[in-house]
């Protein structure tokens, strides 16, 4: 039998959810049930936390649990940040599948997203992180400053486009 859980210990639990929706409590139960928390209540807390900014987007949520209290914080992926920067109207996930986003974002938006993602990137400089975000833009299907993100990546590599150092 596993050792008894210490309630004063800080435990981080990561859950992938759709913003603004109360996920199935049955999917949360195996992760947070042993910590002495109610999956239904945590599901409602997650829905409340993600309802405003991340409605309809798939985001990772970090639950920090200590003394049977859960603190909810959103850990957005690069794709979620890019889709949010597109400012597209919310779509019903159940009706439309495999959405290709055909919007445009500016290079400044990409640099801002890169600054947010810098701590999770393996790149040494900001230019490398910007290239990673541009690759995400290719996957999402949007253009940057009216150009294909692949072309912009090549221009950064050639030195035609300047990226700030920090």
From Swiss-Prot:
<dbReference type="GO" id="GO:0022625">
    <property type="term" value="C:cytosolic large ribosomal subunit"/>
</dbReference>
<keyword id="KW-0689">Ribosomal protein</keyword>
<dbReference type="Pfam" id="PF00298">
    <property type="entry name" value="Ribosomal_L11"/>
</dbReference>
<dbReference type="InterPro" id="IPR000911">
    <property type="entry name" value="Ribosomal_uL11"/>
</dbReference>
<comment type="similarity">
    <text>Belongs to the universal ribosomal protein uL11 family.</text>
</comment>
<comment type="function">
    <text>This protein binds directly to 26S ribosomal RNA.</text>
</comment>
<dbReference type="GO" id="GO:0003735">
    <property type="term" value="F:structural constituent of ribosome"/>
</dbReference>
<keyword id="KW-0694">RNA-binding</keyword>
<dbReference type="Pfam" id="PF03946">
    <property type="entry name" value="Ribosomal_L11_N"/>
</dbReference>
<dbReference type="InterPro" id="IPR020783">
    <property type="entry name" value="Ribosomal_uL11_C"/>
</dbReference>
<keyword id="KW-0699">rRNA-binding</keyword>
<dbReference type="GO" id="GO:0006412">
    <property type="term" value="P:translation"/>
</dbReference>
<dbReference type="InterPro" id="IPR036769">
    <property type="entry name" value="Ribosomal_uL11_C_sf"/>
</dbReference>
<dbReference type="GO" id="GO:0070180">
    <property type="term" value="F:large ribosomal subunit rRNA binding"/>
</dbReference>
<protein>
    <recommendedName>
        <fullName>Large ribosomal subunit protein uL11</fullName>
    </recommendedName>
</protein>
<dbReference type="InterPro" id="IPR020784">
    <property type="entry name" value="Ribosomal_uL11_N"/>
</dbReference>
<keyword id="KW-0687">Ribonucleoprotein</keyword>
<dbReference type="InterPro" id="IPR036796">
    <property type="entry name" value="Ribosomal_uL11_N_sf"/>
</dbReference>
């Amino acid at each position: 039998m596993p050792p008894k859980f210490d309630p004063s210990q800080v435990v981080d639990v990561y859950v992938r959810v759709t913003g603004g929706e109360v996920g199935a409590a049955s999917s949360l139960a195996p992760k947070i049930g042993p910590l002495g928390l109610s999956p239904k209540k945590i599901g409602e807390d997650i829905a409340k936390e993600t309802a405003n900014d991340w409605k309809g987007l798939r985001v990772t949520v970090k639950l920090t649990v200590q003394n049977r209290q859960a603190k909810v914080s959103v850990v957005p992926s690069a794709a979620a940040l890019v889709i949010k920067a597109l400012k597209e109207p919310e779509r019903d996930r159940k009706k439309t599948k495999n959405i290709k986003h055909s919007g445009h974002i500016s290079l400044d938006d990409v640099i801002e997203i890169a600054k947010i993602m810098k701590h999770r990137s393996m790149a040494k400089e900001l230019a490398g992180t910007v290239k990673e975000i541009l690759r995400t833009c290719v996957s999402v299907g949007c253009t940057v400053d009216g150009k294909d993100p692949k072309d912009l990546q090549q221009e950064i590599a050639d030195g035609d486009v300047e990226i700030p150092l920090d």
